C-alpha cells in the first residue's frame, strides 16, 4: 500500500513537474523580455540625453566660433583705416599731412557712436523702403528695429552688456566698421581744402545713414531691391564702394579743386603727394584689411543670425565657403594689379588696381569661378586710369581717385554680376528672384542715387553756410600751419624732399 502510494505519488509529481517547468520557463522568458525592454528604453534615454548634450555642445561651439570670427574681423577691418591714414597722408603735400590724418581718424571716431545711436536702427528699420514696415522674412520694420537695435528701452539687452548674448555686439561691431570704411572712402577725395567740421558732418551722413539705407535695401533678406529685383551684392561693391564714391563726387562738385590744380584753359596740373612710398604702403594695408571686410560678409552659424544651422552662407542665405572666397580674392587682387600695370606702369595706379580688382569682383565673389574673377579684375585695372582722366578733364579734382576706384568700379562690379551671374538665385527662399542684368542695373542706379544725391545736397548746404571749404589763404599756407597745432615735419623737409606748394 505504501509502495503503491509512493508510485502514484511519484507519478503525480512527475506529471506535475512538466507543466510547472513550462510555466516557469514562460514566466522566466517574460521577465527576461521585460528586463530587455527596460534596458533598451534606458539605453535609448541615455543615448537621447547624450545626443542632446552633444547638440547643445555643438551649438555652444558654433556660437563661440561665430563670436570669435566676427570679433576677429573688427581689428582686421581697422587695418583698412590704418591704410587709409597712410594713403591719404602720403598723397597730401607736406604742409597738409597731419590735417589729412586727423580728418581720417575723426571719421572713424564719429562713426561708432552715430552708428550705435541711429545707424544700426536704420539698417533694421528701412529694408522695405521708406514705409518702415515689416518685410516677408519678419526681420525688419520700425517695431523690429526698436526691439533689437535701440540703445535703450526694451532692446537695451541687445545693445549693451548681456552675458547670455554672444551675437549682438560682434555683429554690430562688424557693421560699424563697414560704416567707418564707407566714410573713409570719401575722406581721401577731399584732402587739402575741406573744413574739418564740414567733413565730419558729411562723414556722419554718409557712414551712418546713406550707405546704411543702401545696405537695408540691397544687403538684407527683407530688402526690397533683393526681394523684388533680385539684386545681389555679396561684397558690397555697390552699397559701400559705389555709394561712397558717388557721395564724394557730389561733395567735390561744390568743394571745387585745390588751388593750382587747373589752369585758365581748363588743363590739369599734377599735384604730387609728398611721400609715394607711404601712399603705396597704405594701399597695401587697405588690401590686407579687406580680407577682414570680406570675411565679415559671410554669415557663420550661430545664435539668432544664421540662415543655416550647420554651414556658412552669404547675407542672402545662399551658400559660400571661405575656400572659394580665398581663391577669388587672390585672383582679383592679382588681376587688378596686372591690368593697371599693363595700362599705366604707374606704381600709384598699379596698387589702386589691386583695390579695383577686389571691388570689381566683390558682388559675385560667392559665385564666380576664379578664372572669371581674374578676367573681370584685369578689365577693371585697365579702365581705372582712363576713367579717372575722363573725370579730371571735366574739372573734378579727386586727389586719390576715390570716385573712380570706388564709385565707377563699384558700379562696374554690380553690373558685371548681372552679366555673368544671370539665373543664379539671389536669395535662399522658395520662389526667390534670380540675378538678372536688368535687376543689377536697377540696383546700380539706386546705389548711385543714394550716394550722389545726399553728398550733393549736404555739400550745397554746408557751402551756403560757409562750412565746406577753408579760406584760400589757409589753403595756400597749409592746413597744418593754420588748422592743426602741430607739424608733420617741423624741420620743413619731407622724406621725399622740400614740400611743394
Model-derived features: positions:
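Hydrophobic alpha-helical transmembrane bundles of multi-pass membrane proteins
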Residues: 33-501
